[in-house]
Amino acid sequence: MKFPAFAYXR
């Protein structure tokens, strides 16, 4: 994942 998954909670 190139995006912060922890921030999206996804």
From Swiss-Prot:
Instruction: From the UniProt record, list the reaction(s) this protein catalyses.
Output: quinoline + A + H2O = quinolin-2(1H)-one + AH2
Answer yes or no on keyword GTP-binding: no
**Which superkingdom is the protein from?**
Bacteria
As cofactor, the record names: FAD
- What are the record keywords, sorted? FAD, Flavoprotein, Oxidoreductase
**What pathway annotation does it carry?**
Xenobiotic degradation; quinoline degradation
Report the cofactor remark.
Answer: Binds 1 FAD per subunit.
E.C. designation(s): 1.3.99.17
Q: What class of enzyme is it?
A: oxidoreductase
List GO molecular-function terms, semicolon-separated. Answer: quinoline 2-oxidoreductase activity
| Function in brief | Converts (3-methyl-)-quinoline to (3-methyl-)2-oxo-1,2-dihydroquinoline.
Q: Subunit arrangement?
A: Heterohexamer of two alpha chains, two beta chains, and two gamma chains.
Protein name as it appears in the record: Quinoline 2-oxidoreductase beta chain
The record lists the organism as Comamonas testosteroni
